[in-house]
Amino acid sequence: MIVTQIAGKIQVIFGPMFSGKTTELIRRIKRFNFANKKCLLIKYSKDTRYNDNIDKSFLVTHDKQNYQAFPCSILEDVKEQAQNYDVIGIDEGQFFPDVVQFSEDLANQGKTVIIAALDGTFQRKPFQSVIDLVSKAEYITKLTAVCMVCYNEAAFSKRIVESDDIELIGGIDKYISVCRGCYNSDQNEGNSTKPSKTARHSHSQSAPSVAPLAVNINPDDHLNNDY
């Protein structure tokens, strides 16, 4: 008896703010589209940071790339619609309370699910749902940004406004990417790290360039399986 396996997969793209997670998500979705796969991109409905002059259904990156997306706050609401697609992309995955079960269910049905998410809060504490996804994912990509204080490689997000809320959506007006040294320096001094004037100016229109780090498995090496 021959048993046919349905090749569903979960891909996780994580890292700090301004590391290019959404840009990488859109790149992969475009690539699957080029391979004649039906793709659905889902965005967090409360994230409208860059939608001032564009429809709120579009997902917009820090450097103003945009892509048509379906906005929602609970993934279960779009689960039935997702059945009609081969590939499902999810941006800001850390904010969806049901992201783990949603991704696992669809992957078990033969879908490819790609999640872009922060791996930690501004306090460097993990988002548990993202950690849970790692144990269920076939492909994991960790991205880094550029430190907006010293220009070294940055693995952490630092909040520069006064708020203890975990969910505080914003761009460079509320966050900067920092390296370990600059993050710890701020903690020791007990005040908010501020990007240099040069850093703030140079990053006002676009995010720092992406610096991939510790890529465990590159999905591009598995074209025959994914397409």
Curated annotation (Swiss-Prot):
One GO-annotated biological process of the protein: thymidine metabolic process
Enzyme Commission number: 2.7.1.21
Region annotated Disordered, chain positions: 187-227
GO molecular function annotation: ATP binding; calcium/calmodulin-dependent protein kinase activity; calmodulin binding; identical protein binding; metal ion binding; thymidine kinase activity
Enzymatic reactions: thymidine + ATP = dTMP + ADP + H(+)
PROSITE patterns: TK_CELLULAR_TYPE
Composition skew (Polar residues), residue ranges: 187-196
Residues the record lists as binding substrate: 122, 166-170, 175
Sorted UniProt keywords: ATP-binding, Calmodulin-binding, DNA synthesis, Kinase, Metal-binding, Nucleotide-binding, Transferase, Zinc
Residues that hold Zn(2+) according to the record: 147, 150, 179, 182
Gene3D superfamilies from the UniProt entry: 3.30.60.20, P-loop containing nucleotide triphosphate hydrolases (3.40.50.300)
Subunit structure comment from the entry: Interacts with calmodulin in the presence of Ca(2+).
Protein name from the UniProt record: Thymidine kinase 1
Gene that specifies this protein: thyB
